[in-house]
C-alpha cells in the first residue's frame, strides 16, 4: 500500500489560502481543532492524476517561522517534526500577488527545511488591473522551485498545481540560504546571545 500523500497549504494571513484549499478539496473536507488547543484544523481530500489521493492541510496563517502566536506555533511544530503523522510530503506556499516580497520570507524559510515546495502566486487576475507583471521563469531560477500564477476566481493554475503536487518528487529541495558561505562562528556567537531566535 502506498504512503498517503500529504500536502500542507501555508501562507501569510489574507493570501487566499482557503480559496485554494476549497478549489483542491471541493466538498471533501472537515473542520476540527488541533489536540488540546482551540486553533482550527482544516483538512480535506484531493483527487489527483493516476488515481492518487492527497490529504490536504490548510494550516493557520503565519508570517514567518518565528512564532509569535498559538496559530504560528502549530505551523512550526508540524514542519519541524518529521515524525508527525501530518508532516507534509510537499508544501504549497500561497502568496498574494500584491505583497509578494513580504510573502517570500516565509517561502524561503520553508524551503530551507528541505521540504519539497511550490510557490503559488494567488489573485493573479488583478495583475493587469494593477499594472503588475511577474516573470515566473526568473523567480523559478532564483528560488529553485516551480512558480504558479493562480486565480481562484478564474480557476487559473489549478490543473498545474495538481500536476506539480502529483509529481512533487521532481521538485528541488535545495536551500535558499547558502549555508556554505555563512560565517559559522558569527552565527554561533549570535545563538549564544539569542538562544531562542532562529537564524533568520
State where each predicted segment sits:
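Alpha-helical scaffold segments in soluble metabolic enzymes
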Residues: 19, 23, 74-77, 160, ...
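Canonical P-loop GTPase G-domain recognition
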Residues: 125-178
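Catalytic cores of large soluble enzymes that bind and process phosphate-bearing ligands
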Residues: 31, 67, 98, 131, ...
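Conserved G1/Walker A P-loop phosphate-binding module
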Residues: 1-68
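Amphipathic alpha-helical transducer elements in NTP-driven molecular machines
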Residues: 36, 40, 69-72, 76, ...
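Conserved C-terminal guanine-recognition region of P-loop GTPase G domains, centered on the G4
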Residues: 47-51, 74-146
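Extracytoplasmic
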Residues: 182-200
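Conserved nucleotide-binding/hydrolysis micro-motifs of P-loop NTPases
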Residues: 36, 61-64, 97-100, 123-128, ...
Amino acid at each position: 500500500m502506498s504512503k498517503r500523500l500529504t500536502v500542507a497549504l501555508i501562507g501569510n494571513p489574507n493570501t487566499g489560502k482557503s480559496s485554494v484549499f476549497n478549489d483542491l478539496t471541493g466538498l471533501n473536507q472537515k473542520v476540527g481543532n488541533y489536540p488540546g488547543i482551540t486553533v482550527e484544523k482544516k483538512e480535506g481530500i484531493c483527487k489527483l492524476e493516476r488515481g492518487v489521493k492527497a490529504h490536504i492541510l490548510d494550516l493557520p496563517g503565519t508570517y514567518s517561522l518565528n512564532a509569535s502566536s498559538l496559530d504560528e506555533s502549530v505551523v512550526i511544530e508540524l514542519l519541524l517534526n518529521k515524525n508527525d503523522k501530518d508532516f507534509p510530503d510537499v508544501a504549497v506556499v500561497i502568496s498574494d500577488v500584491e505583497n509578494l516580497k513580504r510573502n517570500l520570507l516565509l517561502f524561503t524559510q520553508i524551503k530551507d527545511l528541505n521540504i519539497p515546495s511550490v510557490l503559488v502566486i494567488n489573485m493573479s487576475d488583478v495583475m493587469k488591473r494593477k499594472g503588475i507583471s511577474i516573470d515566473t521563469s526568473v523567480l523559478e531560477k532564483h528560488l529553485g522551485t516551480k512558480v504558479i500564477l493562480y486565480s481562484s476566481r478564474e480557476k487559473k493554475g489549478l490543473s498545474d498545481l495538481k500536476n506539480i503536487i502529483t509529481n512533487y518528487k521532481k521538485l528541488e529541495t535545495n536551500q535558499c540560504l547558502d549555508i556554505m558561505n555563512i560565517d559559522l562562528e558569527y552565527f554561533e556567537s549570535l545563538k549564544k546571545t539569542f538562544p531562542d531566535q532562529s537564524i533568520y
